[in-house]
């Protein structure tokens, strides 16, 4: 199963993540305690042996162009209401792999109805990968009854409040294509190797 460990800030964190995950991410041009500068991001991209996603909440094409040019990454993770026209321009101009985030409510009175609404939204986009998240790096789980329904229709990456203790049961129930974690594998505001190791072992132990 695809495992992305997001929000790295240093070469030391990158080295840990490379040992366990399939991809990582750097937080850029948005309000986040994990945000780093573009020059730092470029250094991590150049050092990395795995894909490094540039993660941002911006919907401005000029900001995305700046990110691409100054970090050298070909992987973008978009947490905004960016339109398909802008996505098409970026893909055609730069050939980037684009993962688009779709917000799932924390709780739902009608999971089937909410899932259908989100599926309808997803179907208006043409992107390389779909991310289901609770919010913009809030570290909270969402109503997995919704993501379970969506995962039957699309190969989704599941995010939001995942940690070593809950990820086995969540993955077993939702059956995503992959998972994305950040705060759930941190201790003292840094990526923790033991937590990352446990997280990845628990993900890989799920029999789907």
From Swiss-Prot:
Disulfide pattern: none
Record Pfam families: PRAI
This protein's pathway: Amino-acid biosynthesis; L-tryptophan biosynthesis; L-tryptophan from chorismate: step 3/5
Annotated EC: 5.3.1.24
Gene3D superfamilies referenced in this protein's UniProt entry, alphabetically: Aldolase class I (3.20.20.70)
Top-level class of the enzyme under EC nomenclature: isomerase
One of the protein's GO biological processes: L-tryptophan biosynthetic process
Catalytic activity: N-(5-phospho-beta-D-ribosyl)anthranilate = 1-(2-carboxyphenylamino)-1-deoxy-D-ribulose 5-phosphate
UniProt keyword annotations, A-Z: Amino-acid biosynthesis, Aromatic amino acid biosynthesis, Isomerase, Tryptophan biosynthesis
A GO term, aspect molecular function: phosphoribosylanthranilate isomerase activity
Entry superkingdom: Archaea
Family: Belongs to the TrpF family.
Protein name: N-(5'-phosphoribosyl)anthranilate isomerase
């Amino acid at each position: 199963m695809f495992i992305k460990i997001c929000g790295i800030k240093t070469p030391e964190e990158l080295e840990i993540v490379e040992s366990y995950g399939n991809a990582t991410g750097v937080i850029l041009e948005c309000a986040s305690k994990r945000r780093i500068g573009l020059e730092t991001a470029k250094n991590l991209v150049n050092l990395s042996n795995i894909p490094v996603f540039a993660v941002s909440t911006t919907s401005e094409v000029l900001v995305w162009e700046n990110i691409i040019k100054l970090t050298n990454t070909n992987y973008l993770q978009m947490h905004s209401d960016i339109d398909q026209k802008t996505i098409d321009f970026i893909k055609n101009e730069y050939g980037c792999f684009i993962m688009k985030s779709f917000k799932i409510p924390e709780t739902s009175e009608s999971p089937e109805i909410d899932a259908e609404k989100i599926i309808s939204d997803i179907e208006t986009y043409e992107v390389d990968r779909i991310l289901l998240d609770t919010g913009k790096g809030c570290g909270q789980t969402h109503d997995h009854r919704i993501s379970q329904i969506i995962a039957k229709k699309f190969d989704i990456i599941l995010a939001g409040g995942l940690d070593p203790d809950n990820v086995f049961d969540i993955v077993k129930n939702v059956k995503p294509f992959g998972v994305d974690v950040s705060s759930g594998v941190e201790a003292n505001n840094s990526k923790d190797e033991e937590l990352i190791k446990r997280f990845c072992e628990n993900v890989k132990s799920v029999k789907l």
